[in-house]
Amino acid sequence: MSGPAMVHQEPYSVQATAAIASAITFLILFTIFGNALVILAVLTSRSLRAPQNLFLVSLAAADILVATLIIPFSLANELLGYWYFWRAWCEVYLALDVLFCTSSIVHLCAISLDRYWAVSRALEYNSKRTPRRIKCIILTVWLIAAVISLPPLIYKGDQRPEPHGLPQCELNQEAWYILASSIGSFFAPCLIMILVYLRIYVIAKRSHCRGLGAKRGSGEGESKKPHPAAGGVPASAKVPTLVSPLSSVGEANGHPKPPREKEEGETPEDPEARALPPNWSALPRSVQDQKKGTSGATAEKGAEEDEEEVEECEPQTLPASPASVFNPPLQQPQTSRVLATLRGQVLLSKNVGVASGQWWRRRTQLSREKRFTFVLAVVIGVFVVCWFPFFFSYSLGAICPQHCKVPHGLFQFFFWIGYCNSSLNPVIYTIFNQDFRRAFRRILCRQWTQTGW
């Protein structure tokens, strides 16, 4: 089907048409390239293979569909001033437009809920956060978007007369549909996301305050500890689980018998003795050397990369200093204390590698979760800024069509600002997330190297 043969006034001058066409063509290409890069990064980068990143793959796919199936036809409709294509395709085009836009914001809503559950119910939810579960949530997101986008195909509403006899392709103008679709596609998910992120902020703030209190408490406790004796080991230090037959030498020399220590194999009463983070200043040097070779290169490397962005407050289950493990009585004889220290080095050398490796991995994971939550907050904020003007003016026209209608030119500007959002997520990931930065650099450099050869 071809367009009408009649002559009509073009909406833009030749220069404006060329500029708009060039800008939108660049937008289309950049959107496809950037979001394809996001999909490749998640599927090929080890640091981005977490199940929750499948949300980003689906979101990027929706943005690519907007760039390929929606924006080109919107551009033609804008520049020509009428709908050049088949009437049936107009109805499908409008339904797909609503589908992809709704899918994007419902994806962001699902991501924010995933963040909230990961923060508020970390142990319980992380064990259930499997790829299969995430895929089911993504399928539900697309089904919700499809339900909201179906009415334009089923009920077309009252058809307005076409100006100058030219075919037009416009959104449903029924007030009930405008309000229902705006609430379901934008305002309700936005409200959910805002409330969820406020809750995440409250939880993070509370954890931060608890962490500062724990730090102050540990600082006061350390200030009361006795100064270390010769050799760098505190004079009051002992390792629980250490008992030596040579401790009887102290009794034979006239020293009082020290209090009973726990037998090997018993669980220490101090819960902090169960996990030893790598606080080097508090560990014997031989243990430090042992730790350097046994803690796992991958965990240390990840922690070093995230060092500048590590959370200020660690969970309270992670002890602030391994020095808290050592806490023996002052009257313990020197011979027994030295022997206990030596045996303590042997004991620590067996366990510190595993414990501190787990500590580093947990620390790196928490840092990555924190940064990823911040990135998603930026993504949601940018989405709201881009789409709010359109949905607000669209709803306003349905509430009071006579007096509150937004001028057509301004409405079209809001319309295109919303489309621009599809190209922004890859930029946000690049600016705010070093895992994506490294993955993008690796993919692009590999492609350029292969092309150069």
Curated annotation (Swiss-Prot):
Any one GO biological process: G protein-coupled receptor signaling pathway
Keyword list, A-Z: Cell membrane, Disulfide bond, G-protein coupled receptor, Lipoprotein, Membrane, Palmitate, Receptor, Transducer, Transmembrane, Transmembrane helix
Transmembrane segments annotated in the record for this chain: 18-42, 55-80, 91-113, 136-158, 175-198, 376-399, 409-432
| Implicated in ligand binding (site feature) positions | 97
What are the Acidic residues biased-composition ranges? 303-314
Site Implicated in catechol agonist binding: list residues.
181, 185
What is a single cellular component term in the Gene Ontology annotation? cell surface
The annotated region (Disordered) lies at 214-329
Give residue spans on the Extracellular membrane side: 1-17, 81-90, 159-174, 400-408
User: Which SMART domains does UniProt cross-reference here?
Assistant: 7TM_GPCR_Srsx
The record gives the membrane topology as: Multi-pass membrane protein
Residue numbers on the Cytoplasmic membrane side? 43-54, 114-135, 199-375, 433-453
Q: Which Pfam families does the protein's record reference?
A: 7tm_1
Question: What subcellular compartments does it reside in?
Answer: Cell membrane
Q: List the disulfide bonds.
A: 90-169
- Principal location listed in the UniProt entry: membrane
Residues bearing a lipid moiety (S-palmitoyl cysteine): 445
A Gene Ontology molecular-function term?
Answer: adrenergic receptor activity
Subunit architecture? Interacts with RAB26. Interacts with PPP1R9B. Interacts with GGA1, GGA2 and GGA3.
- Which function does this protein serve? Alpha-2 adrenergic receptors mediate the catecholamine-induced inhibition of adenylate cyclase through the action of G proteins.
Family to which the UniProt record says this protein belongs: Belongs to the G-protein coupled receptor 1 family. Adrenergic receptor subfamily. ADRA2B sub-subfamily.
Would you tell me the protein name for this molecule?
A: Alpha-2B adrenergic receptor
Species this protein is from: Mus musculus
Q: What is the lineage of its organism?
A: Eukaryota, Metazoa, Chordata, Craniata, Vertebrata
